[in-house]
Structure formats: C-alpha cells, structure tokens
Amino acid sequence: MSPYAPENNQDPGGGLVTEGNQPQQNNFVNTNKSPTTTPPPQTSNVVSTPPATAINAAGVNNGLINGVLNNSSSSSSSSSSSSSSSPTPTSISPPLSDIEQTLNAYPTDLPELVVAACWWAESLGKLNMNIPKENIKRFRKELIFALRDRIKGHWYPDYPERGQGYRAIICEETTDRLLMDAAKKSDIVGEFRQLVKQNTTMWIDPGNVTYRHGKHYEKTLYPFNSINNHYSHHNNNNNNNNGINITNSNNTIPINTSGYHNINNHLNNSNNTIPPQQSQQHINNNNNNSNNNTTNNIILNSLHHHQTQISQQHLNNNNNQNNFSYGITSTRLTQNVVNSNSNGLNGRVSSPSLSSTAPVFSPSNSMYHHVQQQSHSPSISPPASPSKDLGNSSGNNTNVYSSNNNLFYNSNTSSSKIKLAYS
C-alpha cells in the first residue's frame, strides 16, 4: 500500500471531508520519509490541487506555500522600502543645506531675505534638474536684490504684521513678478510658471519667514537654531532695560512700579522738618493769640451784650482768624477761613469781607489804643455797632485802664440809652 493512499477522511480527489464540527486539517507530506507526519490541528483556507499523482500534488503544494511566503516577504519589503521613500507631508520643503554659507556671503542683508531667496532657489533646482547650478545661484542672488528693493520703506521691526501682504511672495493664480524677473535675469528659459511650485505663499516678516503650500501645509523657515536671531537678542536687551531708576545723592527711586508714592515719601521726608526754634515761636504765638481771645471775649461780651447777631458773627470770625494755624512753610494763608466754633456753625464759610486780609476790630489790637488816644476823631468807629448808639460818644463816656494785663471798662452811659436803642 502506498503511503500517499487516501485515508478515511480524504476523498480520492484530494478534497478535505469534514465530519460534524471537526476542524479542517491538512496533511503535509515529507518526501524524504515514508510515514506521514501530522502537525497540530489548525484552520486553513488552502484548497488542495485537482487530482494528480501524490508526488506532483505534494510538489505543487510546497511550491504554492513557498511562493506565497516569498511573495509576502517581497511585498512587505517592497512596501517598507516604498513607505520609507515616499515623501511625508513635512518633507515638502527641501533642506537649506548651504544657508550658513549664503548668510556669510551676504552679511549686510537681512537674514529673512536670504532665507526666503535660498528656499525659492533650491525649490527651483530640485524641481528642474536640467537647470545649471550657476543659473540657480544667479537666480538666488537676483531674488535677494529684488526682495531688498521690495521691503524698502515697508519694514517695521516693532510691528511685524504691518505691510505683511505687500512683502509676501504669492504664486497662486498668477506667478509673482519678483520671481519671473529674477529668472529672466538669470537666463532661465522656459515657462517659469511650470518651473516653480504653485499654490504657494511665503510671508517675509521681521523675525519670521513662513510659507504655505496648498491649504493645509505650512512651515516656518526662520528663525532657526543654527543662526542667532538678532531681533530676539534686541528684544531681550529691551526687556532687561525696562526698569528705569532715577538716582540722586541720597537714594534711588524706582519709577517702574509705584513711583508716585516713592517720590511723594521722598519729598515729605525732605520738606516736613521744621527747625525747633521756628516751631517754638509758633507755639508762643498761638498762646498769645489764645490769651488775647479770652480777654476779647470778656470785654466785648460786657460791652455788646445786647448787640445784634451781626456783631456776634463778626466776633466768631475774629476768633477763627486768631486761632488759625500756620502751614508747614510758616506763611499765613490768604484764603477764606472755616468757622469751627462749637456754636453749631461747623462747615460754614466766612464772607470774603471777613477774610484774613480784612482789618479786624479788637480791643487788644493796636488800632483800638490808637482810637482811644484820638478819641475826638469821628471817622473811626466799631463796624458792628448801631449808628444811633455812637452818636453821642465822646472821651468822657469811655475810659480804659490797663493793669496786670487785665482790662476794665467803665461806662457812664445810662440804661435808658440802651433801652432806647433796642426799643
């Protein structure tokens, strides 16, 4: 009996017969040995070949398996190689290999212009291998010169967005005239629109060069780490100098944080000091004014007990003027005084005629003694007294005696006159 004869579970045609829920199995034949080896059960979708000799069937099966394995390995290797060679979305921009040499060749030009010109030149060279390299270099040079003329008067380092649309190189529906002129000067023949990338826009701004290809891909070419960005360095210097100090012989006042309070404190510390002698003089003057006010109250209350409210208001204003405190600079203020007596007149402003500059009638004033010495002069009289009470005033009616800093007043006026004055 041949070792390749069919068994109970195999039909003569080589097809697999399944019984019940038993899994399908394949018998792999080893041509070197006579017994048949059966591997562990596994599912398989491989259908045996049409009826043939056992050796041919086994050979075909081995060939198919080897072919499938070889094809799968070759397809996987080809797919991996194709995936590694296919361009990624971020590899559209060609590398700027000689950018450092170009920057050194144009030290007086802005690096933004050099980077932009190098990118367009290398893109043109990569897409058109038949263009000589010398023409590509000339194209780059002419483009740098053209960009230099374009940004003249439209370059604002403090406002990079200003003039952005004017400086941009646009190849959308039409090709930018800047590129076409540079190609013409570089002896690059042919339709230039077919030589460069379309649907590309490049923005050349102070401190930044970015291009967009299509609608979704965008890449920044400048700044980059290999070259120092002098604009960022300039901005760092400005940030370090933001704190400005004003220095004098005594101290330093920073004005970048809370300058108003510091300057105010500095001025207060220098101006609020009063010499001891001057402050003592102010205290003595205030004491003298207080004593005079007490004397004034005693005498005037006895003299004008029945006077009108006008004379009382005049007296209150007089007390305010005598008790008015001097300022830091020891100068008397010539403004209206506020009546601050305890008679319910708080916050009341005096009349302009009763201000500190107006002459005030007071018994302690030198003007009062001058009136007594020249009592026969009818031109001077107390301003608040009624005119009919002063009609018969003479030197015999009023006598003033001073002794031990006390003033006494004797009046010969009868009470009938007082009653007559207020009848």
Swiss-Prot record:
PANTHER family: B-CELL TRANSLOCATION GENE, BTG FAMILY PROTEIN. It comes from Dictyostelium discoideum. One of its GO terms (cellular component) is cytoplasm. Residues 1-54, 69-96, 257-297, 341-398 are annotated as: Disordered. Residues 19-28, 273-283, 352-367 have a biased composition (Polar residues). Transmembrane segments: none annotated. It comes from the Eukaryota. Belongs to the BTG family. GO terms for biological process: cell fate commitment. Residues 43-54, 257-272, 284-297, 341-351, 369-379 have a biased composition (Low complexity). It holds the Pfam family BTG. SMART domains: btg1. Gene3D superfamilies: Anti-proliferative protein, N-terminal domain. The lineage of its organism: Eukaryota, Amoebozoa, Evosea, Eumycetozoa, Dictyostelia. InterPro entries: Anti_prolifrtn (IPR002087), BTG (IPR033332), BTG-like_sf (IPR036054). This is BTG family protein.
